[in-house]
Amino acid sequence: MRREEAIRAVVAGDHPDPFSFLGPHEEAGRRVVRTFLPGAARVRVLSAAGRPLGELERVHPEGFFSGPLSGNGRYRLRVLWEGGGEDELEDPYRFPPVLSDYDLYLFGEGNNHRIYRHLGAHPAEMDGVCGTAFAVWAPNARRVSVVGDFNLWDGRRHPMRNRNGVWEIFLPGVGPGALYKYEIKDAGGSLLPLKADPYGFFAEQYPGTASIVWDLSRHRWEDGEWMERRGSRNAPDAPMAIYEVHLGSWRRRPDGSHLTYRELAEELVPYVAGLGYTHVELLPPMEHPFGGSWGYQPVGLFAPTSRFGPPEDFKHLVDAFHRAGVGVIADWVPAHFPEDAHGLARFDGTHLYEHADPRKGRHPDWGTLIYNYGRNEVRNFLISNALFWLDEYHIDGLRVDAVASMLYLDYSRKEGEWVPNEHGGNENLEAIAFLRRMNEVVYGEAPGAFTVAEESTAWPMVSRPTYMGGLGFGYKWNMGWMHDTLQYMKEDPVHRRYHHDRITFGLLYAFNENFILPLSHDEVVHGKGSLLGRMPGDRWQRFANLRAYYGFMYGHPGKQLLFMGGEFAQEREWDSGSQLDWHLLEGGENRGVRDLVADLNALYRATPALHQVDFEPEGFEWVEGGDAEQSVVSFLRRARNPEDFVLVVSNFTPVVRHGYRVGVPASGPYAEVLNTDDPRYGGSGVANGELEAEEVPWHGRPFSLRLTLPPLATVFLRPRPV
């Protein structure tokens, strides 16, 4: 390209390789510097020490300057602007590349697992100059520029260097707090809508959509003890009672505005810890423009939402949970992304992150786009994001949303709306390979962290290691258990005898996976009402049913999860636009449910038989699972030491069962350690107190207890040490 053509191309924002022309270069045997500064009247060159080295000639009226540069050292530009005022600027085009060749090679392979340390916007120092290093992947773009509040959002000012499809530039003087986006020209030369940074660490509050340069090192962590021991606390034999939270609607200020991350650290953390929960699960904390998506349509996967404060304040919240002994799980959405113009959709003018074929690239239910898991750089983006939350924010676990939609090519699609895989089947082989690799990387590179699958089908071995042929998750939500048992609880007690299999069926497959029992947010939205509202009977019976159900759940094999509000029997459907109905705690019935949940958590955590062998048949034993006529179930839970056991009995009718005999394996005294019918919880007070096992064989066991079963209640009994 001739010199005049190159100048015109720079001024028009069309130069294919701006670093080959702008900045310092050899020309006709001498060293020259070229710069494009729209609005500049004069430009002088200074040495690093401030000594004048000469003045550049204005060679284009739009602000292109060129001139000789004496010496080979550093230089700065002194700019006199047309409107008055003067600045001393570093020239971005004198600095070397941002990424190494090796980083680019690994990224192209899909194996640069922490590429977030290189792509995006990183405050940095180069050649003694402070600024920000920008890098973005857009392989099909003709030109990419950084635009922001530091350059009047003018894409001609800072076009980037293209290296293997990654565009990069170091901008001196740009630091934390600067707003920015990428201006991209597609292969045909058309300007696309300004794009937020896919790897951006912080973003404007909606309706603003710009990314914000941010320094993630501002928080000083104080959770070292937790991080050292978290592997044992997140292990399959540890208690795991999870409180699921939507941060925006847990509690609000009197004026209806959101609590900040720091306010949540002061209020939410002690609340969760005080109830005895071991973990909190946050609905997706990533940046999302549409609040009504609850975070499940994220645009900024690397940015905690700015609704509640800056990134360091989110770190403060996680830190506070850890110091209170509570682990943090984040919902994570690698299944799809929204079509917002500033997001990933057609990022460089092509279907870059998504499949071009809508039969593979568009989700018919949600109107969102599906990641192209077969592309190395897209897999790298997602795997790097998973590690980012575990590394940078000390997140303990990732609950992967909508896994079923990833596994099946025909998920929610009719005949002719999907494309079979290479073997003619409906399995999404690329998504399966991605999930397996993601889990291998998480478990291999983030010690003590874990993953959870929200997977609603019968796909086998979801929570089994990849070397065994599994998907590699640590845990899986037991959606079948949740649907069956809730359906059972909705039945009038007089009819439950005809649906007894719904309450027992889960034990047929309880040990096929490492299950979490989820009473999640999905069960209190979209017209389903509250958990309490789905219980039959009058008000007293509804509360009693709910208490009995919670007791049964805590006795059942599997880890525990309850969505916020369930702990005090929220009476209306969850509304993400307001806070929970905290005034209900003024009533004894709701307060009683909260006290029951706290006591269930305490019992669960203190009793190895209730959590130590959740995922093996040795941890569970039916005593009587077939008493459909009386709607009673009874079973034993055992610890690693089989002599350490708990007897759980649930009566799902409002009839007091006097003299109900239950077989037990050991003689001696037994104590009722928890009864959901306790008056402290709002119950009627039918109790057993101290019991002595009788030498009356029952249920195939040498001894038995003669119980009084309270109405609509679950009781826990265990041998009392003599």
Curated annotation (Swiss-Prot):
The family classification in the record reads: Belongs to the glycosyl hydrolase 13 family. GlgB subfamily.
Gene3D superfamilies linked: Glycosidases, Golgi alpha-mannosidase II, Immunoglobulins
Q: State if Nucleotide-binding is listed as a keyword.
A: no
Subunit arrangement?
A: Monomer.
Which Pfam families does the record associate with it? Alpha-amylase (PF00128), Alpha-amylase_C (PF02806), CBM_48 (PF02922), GlgB_N (PF22019)
Q: Which organism is it from?
A: Rubrobacter xylanophilus (strain DSM 9941 / JCM 11954 / NBRC 16129 / PRD-1)
Query: For this protein, what reaction is catalysed?
Result: Transfers a segment of a (1->4)-alpha-D-glucan chain to a primary hydroxy group in a similar glucan chain
EC number(s) reported in the record = 2.4.1.18
Gene Ontology cellular component list? cytosol
The protein's name in its UniProt record: 1,4-alpha-glucan branching enzyme GlgB
What is this protein's function per UniProt? Answer: Catalyzes the formation of the alpha-1,6-glucosidic linkages in glycogen by scission of a 1,4-alpha-linked oligosaccharide from growing alpha-1,4-glucan chains and the subsequent attachment of the oligosaccharide to the alpha-1,6 position.
State the SUPFAM superfamilies in the record.
(Trans)glycosidases, E set domains, Glycosyl hydrolase domain
The pathway it acts in is: Glycan biosynthesis; glycogen biosynthesis
Any GO BP annotation = glycogen biosynthetic process
Q: Which PANTHER family match?
A: 1,4-ALPHA-GLUCAN-BRANCHING ENZYME
| GO MF annotations in UniProt | 1,4-alpha-glucan branching enzyme activity; cation binding; hydrolase activity, hydrolyzing O-glycosyl compounds
Kindly indicate whether the keyword Transferase belongs to this entry.
Answer: yes
Q: Which residues form the active site?
A: D401 (nucleophile), E454 (proton donor)
* Gene that encodes it: glgB
